[in-house]
């Protein structure tokens, strides 16, 4: 029984006004498909344990003026995917990584090409795979680019670039539409959620308090502040339906890796406040 994300494909997303007429159809067929899928698998017992990880990386550019987002995520992902394909043609057993687009145009995601099994040998492969993927990514960057292990870019929304705000997609006064991945899904997702709400996203992260703090929250007005967080996600194929109902990874999760956004400190340092 699988737990995790879906494969991202290219298509024509419907604008919100066009999508509204199809909501009832989508909901009903979604329920029907879920029931059929559930019935096919509800009696499975002792299914093979398979698992994998998804790692999201943020790409940043360094200059004498400081750090900024490097909006080359799609370009870097295409380069890495082409390199994997070339390796696979030359040496079939190589090319062990799949690269995926992510919400931010400064982001790239990697997964192992094939899932790990429950055997010890595969457990030992996890760290080496993560190291190998990061090494491949770094080799695709320019000399002035870095990809550190951080969840959120602290300067996002601080106007440290010349890109126009209030774009037609996010309509944000803090971040430009350029930070959204050019894949059609992400722009449509951003615009449709805003149009469905009738207003911009309203993010309020609790502000760290000290003697000189004014205000209680850090405000943001775009999905990029949450969807732009880089995370490690784990996908499991569970042995049966009962096991798949419970998130067994919860005791292992740690969330205090987002100490600041918009250059001020968050009270609890958790990226969930930005989603």
Predicted feature locations:
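Phosphate/nucleotide-binding catalytic core
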Residues: 2-275
């Amino acid at each position: 029984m699988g737990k995790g994300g879906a494969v991202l494909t290219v298509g024509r997303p419907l604008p919100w006004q066009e999508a509204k007429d199809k909501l009832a159809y989508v909901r009903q067929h979604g329920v029907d498909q879920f029931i059929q899928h559930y019935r096919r698998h509800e009696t499975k017992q002792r299914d093979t344990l398979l698992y994998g990880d998804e790692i999201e990386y943020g790409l940043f550019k360094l200059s004498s003026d400081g750090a900024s987002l490097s909006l080359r995520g799609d370009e870097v992902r295409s380069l890495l995917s082409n390199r994997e394909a070339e390796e696979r043609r030359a040496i079939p057993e190589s090319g062990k990584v799949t690269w995926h687009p992510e919400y931010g145009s400064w982001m790239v995601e990697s997964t192992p090409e094939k899932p790990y099994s429950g055997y010890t040998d595969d457990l030992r492969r996890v760290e080496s795979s993560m190291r190998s993927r990061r090494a491949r990514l770094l080799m695709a960057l320019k000399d002035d680019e870095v990809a550190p292990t951080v969840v959120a870019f602290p300067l996002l929304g601080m106007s440290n670039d010349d890109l126009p705000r209030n774009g037609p997609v996010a309509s944000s006064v803090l971040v430009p539409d350029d930070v959204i991945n050019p894949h059609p899904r992400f722009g449509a997702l951003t615009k449709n959620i805003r149009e469905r709400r009738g207003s911009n996203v309203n993010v309020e992260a609790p502000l760290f308090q000290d003697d000189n703090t004014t205000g209680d929250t850090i405000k943001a007005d775009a999905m990029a502040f949450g969807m732009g967080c880089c995370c490690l996600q784990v996908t499991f194929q569970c042995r049966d339906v009962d096991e798949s109902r419970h998130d067994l990874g919860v005791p292992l999760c740690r969330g205090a890796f987002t100490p600041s956004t918009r250059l001020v400190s968050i009270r609890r340092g958790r990226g969930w406040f930005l989603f």
